[in-house]
Amino acid sequence: MASTVTQAAERDDPADWLRLIRSRRVGAVTFHRLMGEHGSARAALQALPELARAAGVEGYEVCPLGVAQAEIKAGRACGAQLLLWGGPGYPAGLMDLADAPPVLWTRGDTGLLQRPMVAIVGARNASSLGLRMARRLAEGLGASGQVVVSGLARGIDAAAHEAALATGTVAVMAGGVDVIYPEENADLAAQIAAKGCLVAEH
C-alpha cells in the first residue's frame, strides 16, 4: 500500500488529496485505506458516494473542489507549502503510522522534518525552575543535533522553542499553519517560520 500511495503523491492533484481528507467521515485511517484500495485520491473520491450509500448514508457529497482550491490559495498567500504523505519533504518519521496525517501545511525549513527530533512539552503556567530546565534541555538537545518539537503554547513550549531557534525547532500547530495561538507568541511564530518550521494539518 505504501508504494501505491507514494506514487499517487507524486502524480495526483494536491486538491484531490485535500478534497478526500476534508470529506465527511474521512479521517486519516480511512484516507489511507481508500488510497490503498483505489490507487489515487480522484478514484477514491469517485467511489465515496457509492461506498457511503452501501453503508446506509444517503445523499453523501464529497468535499467540493472549490473548498480545496480556496485552501490551497490561502496556504500560498501565507507562504505555506503543502506536503503529501509519501511525497517529497514529508516527514519520514510519520510514514509508518497508520493514522499519519495525509497532508501537512508547512512554513519554513522543511529540511528540519527529516532530522532526528525530540518533543518537549509541558505546563502553560510553568514555574521559573521549569522554564529554566526546559531551556537547558532544549539547548542541550539542539547542540547534539536534535530538532526540538513543541506546540507553540505559552510556558514550557515557548521556552523550548526559544532555546532551540539557533539549532532547529518545529512548532506543531493545532489551529492551522496561519492561525497563531496564543497571540502573545506571534513574534515567536514568525521567528520559527524564518529559522525553523511551522507545521499543521490545516
What do these predicted ranges mean?
Residues M1-D13, L84-H202:
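Glycine-biased, small-residue-rich flexible motifs in mid-sequence functional cores and linkers
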